[in-house]
C-alpha cells in the first residue's frame, strides 16, 4: 500500500512537472503547451483517485514516508510526505478544480501571446500547493508556502503594463511577507527548542513547553496568507489579475494555505486557550467585516473576492472552536462553488466587453441561460442552501458554534456574517441575472464554446454533490453534538432566510432610490472598505514620510549645517576679525607690525 501511495504521488509530480521541464527544450515551435498542461492536470486527477480509493477502503489513519535529505551535527532535514485524510482528499479536489480552470483559461486567454507561460505559472502554483499539502515537515511546508506566494505575485501582476496590476501584486507580496515573518519565527522556535522540524516529532516534543509564542506566530502566518482582518486588503486588490488566476487563487490554493497550516498543526493548539480564542475572535471579525464590505461593492469580482474572505473567516472560527475537520470540509466544498462563481464572472465579463460593474448588467438569464444557472447554483451553495455542497460544511460549523461554550460576541458576529452572505449573494444574482438588460446591445455574447460550458458544468456538479460525497467518506475525529433544540438546529437556515428577505427588501428599495450614491455613513463605510486601505495605504505612509522629512530637515539644519560649515565659520570669526583689522590704513598698526617683523628677523642673529 505504501508503495502505491509513493508511486502514485511521484507519478502525479512527474506528470505535472513534464510540461514545466519542456521549457528547457530548444525546439518548441508549434507545440500546444497550454493544451498539454490541461491534459497533464486531468491525468494527474484520475491517478490521484487511486490512492484515495485504496486509503478509504483500508480505513487507515495515515501513512508517513521519510527520506533523509541533509543533516548537520545537531539537526536533520528530511523529505517526508504525509498521506492522511487531509492530503489525500485535498489533492484530487485541487487537481479537479485546476483542470476546470485551465480548460476555461484556454478560452479566456486564447489571444494572449504568452499563454504558454501563463499555463506554466498556473501549473507551478498548483505544484507548490501540492507540496504544501503533502509535506510532513516544516521545511517542505515552507517551500510550498513560499512557492504559492511567489507564483501569486507573478500571476496577479500578469498584465504588468497596468499600474494597478503591479500595485496589487506588490501588495499581495508585502502583506504575505508580514505573515511569513510569523512562520519563519515559529520554525526558528521549533529548531531552537525542539531541535526538529518533523511535524509528528513536534507534536510529541512540545508537550513540556508553553507553545503560546510559536502559536501566535502561526496565527500571524495564517492571517497574512488567508487574508484575515488586519492583513486582508491584498485579497480584493488581487482581482487585478486575470479571472482564471482569481479562481485558482481563491478556491484551492493560496488563500486556504494559511487555514491548512493551522489544520496540520492543530494538535499543538487544541489545549492552548489563548491561541484558540485568538483564532475565534479574529475569524469572527474577518467574517463580519468582509461580508459588510461585500454588501455595497459594485464590481462583480470584488464581491466574490470579499465572499472568499468572509468564508475564510468562518474557517478560522471553526479552528477556534477546536474543529479542524469541519474547517477542512469547508475548504473542500468551498473550492468548487468559489471557482465556479469566478469562472461564471469571467464568462460574463468577457461577453459584456470587459464590463465588471453589476449595475451595467442584468437580464442575463434569457441571453446566457447556462452561465446564469450555474452562477445561481454557486450563489445558493455559498449561502448554505440545503443539500448543495456548502450546506454540509456550513451547517455543521454553525451547529458546532451554537453548541460550544464560547465568546458570545464571536457567535453573534459569525451569525450576522452568515446572514450577510445571503444578502450579497442575492444582490449579486438580482443585479446580474434578473431584471432587464442594462448593457450595450452590441456586446458579443456567446456561451456556446464547449471549453466554457464544460469547465463550469464540471464545477457545478462538484457544487451540488461534493458535500454529500465527502461527508459520506469522512468520519469525524470528534463526536459532534447529537441532540439539540430545533431552533439551534435550524439556526444556520434561519439566519440565511432572514438575510434573503432583507436582500429582497433592499432590492425593491434600490429601484426607488433617487440619488446614485446616497450619503449614508454606514453605506459609505462599507463602500470604502471600512476606510482600511485609505488609512493603511495613504495615511500611514504620509505620516511616516512627514516624520522622515522633518527628521531629515532637523538633522540637516542642526548637525550637518550648524555643527558643520556654519559652526566652523563661527569659531574662525574672531581670528578672522583680528587679521582683518590689519589692512585698514592705520599707520600705528603698520609701524607695530614692521617693528615686530624686524625684531623676529634680528633675534636669530643676536642669539
Curated annotation (Swiss-Prot):
Catalytic function, reaction form: a ubiquinone + NADH + 5 H(+)(in) = a ubiquinol + NAD(+) + 4 H(+)(out)
Enzyme class: translocase
Keyword Transmembrane: yes
Gene Ontology cellular component list: mitochondrial inner membrane
Subcellular location(s) of the protein: Mitochondrion inner membrane
Leader peptide range in chain numbering: none
UniProt keyword annotations, A-Z: Electron transport, Membrane, Mitochondrion, Mitochondrion inner membrane, NAD, Respiratory chain, Translocase, Transmembrane, Transmembrane helix, Transport, Ubiquinone
Functional description taken from the UniProt entry: Core subunit of the mitochondrial membrane respiratory chain NADH dehydrogenase (Complex I) that is believed to belong to the minimal assembly required for catalysis. Complex I functions in the transfer of electrons from NADH to the respiratory chain. The immediate electron acceptor for the enzyme is believed to be ubiquinone.
Protein name: NADH-ubiquinone oxidoreductase chain 5
Species name: Carassius auratus
